[in-house]
Amino acid sequence: MIPLNRRASQTRGGMEYFDARRKPHNVGKVIAALVLTTLCIFILKQSPGFGGSSVFSRHEPGVTHVLVTGGAGYIGSHASLRLLKDNYRVTIVDNLSRGNMGAVKVLQELFPQPGRLQFIYADLGDQKTVNKIFAENAFDAVMHFAAVAYVGESTLEPLRYYHNITSNTLLILEAMASHGVKTLIYSSTCATYGEPEKMPIVETTRQLPINPYGKAKKMAEDIILDFTKGRKDMAVMILRYFNVIGSDPEGRLGEAPRPELREHGRISGACFDAALGIIPGLKVKGTDYPTTDGTCIRDYIDVTDLVDAHVKALNKAEPSKVGIYNVGTGRGRSVKEFVDACKKATGVNIKIEYLSRRPGDYAEVYSDPTKINTELNWTAQYTDLKESLSVAWRWQKSHPRGYGSN
C-alpha cells in the first residue's frame, strides 16, 4: 500500500509516476509538438536541399554547372564573375592559401539567388576530399585555375610546386574520370616554353621550361594529353597565357595577394604597393638582358580579356578534341615601359631600384595569338597598358588592404 501521506507523483525505485489529473495538460503539449514537427517537415521538404540533395547535385537541362578550382584567387574570381554573369552555375573550390574569401563574398552578394554559386573550402591535394566533392556535385565542366604561381618562389620550393600543380591536376583528372565529367579548361602558362630562340611564340614552339613553375605546368599538360588519348569523350582546352594585369572594369574585384607573398607577386602589384607607400619603391630585377633597354620583355594580357578567352574555350570545347592556345596580345613591352605606364596610371613618381636578375627568369616572351583569334574568335580588347593599369589602380586605391578595406 502507498502511505496516505505520500503524493502519487513521488518517485519509487528511480521511476516516476504522474498524477492522472495532469494528463490533459501533457496531452496538449504532445499534440502541439506533433503539429510543430509536421509543419517543420513540410517546410523542410520544400527546401532544395531536402534529403541530402541540392540543385548543385543534380544535372539540370539548360544549366551548365562549372567547377572553378582556385576561384577565390585573382584570375579564378574574375572567371567566376564572368561565368555567373553569363548564367552558369558555379562551384568554387579553394583552400584560401593564395585566394581571398573577400572575393567570394563579393560574388555571393552579387549573385545571392539559390542554385547560382556555392563555395567549398577544400584542399585539392587530398584525394578523398576531391572524390567527395565530385560525388556530391553534378559538374558539367571544370575550369582548373588552382595553383601556386610564382616563378621566383618555385625555384626556392620546387617540390611544393610539383605537388600543388602536377599532382593535384592528376587527382582532378582521376575524379573527372570516376564521375563522368568530360570537359576541362586548363589554366596553363607561357612559362612552359622557357626561353625560345624565336619570337613571337606559337603553340608549336618547343616547350623547354627553365623553372619549376613552368616544368610543373608542362608535366600537368603532358598528363592531360596522355589521359585524353584513351578517352574520346573528353573535351579539353589548354590555355597558355602570358602576364596578367588589370581588374574588373566595374571595380568589384581586384588583385589582393597576401602580405607575405608580395615579394613574389606580379610587377603590377609591386608598382601599386610603391604608389600607395606600402613599400619604399619598386625593385626591377635585371637590367642586362639582351633587349632594347636591358629589361625583360613581356606580353601583358588584361584579366578581363583572359576570362573571356576561357568562356569562349568552354563554349567551343568538343569531345575527342584538345585545343591548345596562347592567350596574349601579340605585343611585347619592356619592364621599363611598364613602369612608365604605371607611373602615369597612378600619378605617382615611383622610386625605382635596379637589382640583379631573378633566378629562372627569361629575357623576352610574347605571343602570336593568331590561332585563338581564328579558331575561338577571340581577340584581346584591353590592350592599352596605361588604361588597364588605371582600372586596376582605382580598385587598389580604394582597397589598400585588399578585401579587408574599402
UniProtKB/Swiss-Prot annotation:
One of its GO terms (biological process) is UDP-L-arabinose biosynthetic process. NAD(+) binds at residues 65-96. SUPFAM superfamilies: NAD(P)-binding Rossmann-fold domains. It is a single-pass type II membrane protein. Its cofactor is NAD(+). Its EC number is 5.1.3.5. The keyword Transmembrane applies. It holds the Pfam family GDP_Man_Dehyd. It is an enzyme of class 5 (isomerase). One of its GO terms (molecular function) is UDP-glucose 4-epimerase activity. GO terms for cellular component: Golgi cisterna membrane. Pathway: Nucleotide-sugar biosynthesis; UDP-L-arabinose biosynthesis; UDP-L-arabinose from UDP-alpha-D-xylose: step 1/1; Cell wall biogenesis; cell wall polysaccharide biosynthesis. Its main location: Golgi. The active site is at 213 (proton acceptor). Belongs to the NAD(P)-dependent epimerase/dehydratase family. This is Probable UDP-arabinose 4-epimerase 3.
